Amino acid sequence: MNKNTFEPGLSLLRQPVAPLVSMVQFLYLTGPFATVAEVVGEMPEPIETELAIYEHPVALLREYLEFLQPLESLKSEQEIGEDVVDEQGEPVDRMTAVSALVMQQVLTAELEKINSRLCGPCNCTLCCTGPSAGMSQEFFEIPLAPREIDLFDVDRCDHADSRAHRARDEEELYCDGRPFYRRRSPGLFHWQNGWSLILPRGAQCPNLEAGSGRCRVYAQRPEVCRRPQIFPYMLERLDEPRAGSPVYRLRQTLLAVVDCPYVRELQDDIARYAAAAELHLAWKENKS
């Protein structure tokens, strides 16, 4: 596949915002600035880093200004409302926690734009179909927020038994006397950890147009569908809150799904993006 096909997304991938965010944080904490917006407004133009030249860094940073606001809590001592722990479960220092929470939000927003531009030219339905006959998986799961479930006109499974299970529990949920994934058509399931659309073997998303492969609800598509197949894993949300506050484990990883055509094609560029964000890069297969 010609790399020119990916130019709209590739141009963004090659100008990662993470180095600029790190500059803003440093300048804000070491300078006489009352707000992060002041720092952004005084950034020089252009800015050249080891990996990229940013002709208009101020305009770029302003796209993410709302996600940078928590940095101001580092000067005000305002509570951030989330706890972050390391791999051993020990709390990290305040600056590490705030920096990670900010970067997770920034990278999530940035990669939504990048993935959306890279995905279109591939005419790929990898994320929209269940496993094929030769794959080891029995089903494909698309996690959904409660507000997204009405996008799918399929059968629902929502009862005490389903809400006591998770899709990948060793002790499987049974529906109508058989494992939940042994069905011919997609279904919505309300699990212990939320809702998801289950695509069994050979099934496809009900919003996928036959023949064209277009998504009927593209403009309103679920959040998880907006972020294939490169996504930030700065933080992993844990199930056990502390005193009612969300708890996250620091991961500092970028995940890239190698089943995806553009991920396979752009591995070097993705590696440079991860390096710019100072993230460990993990390649993984979603289906096999």
Identify the role of each PLM range.
Residues M1-S288:
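Short loop/turn segments that flank or connect secondary-structure elements
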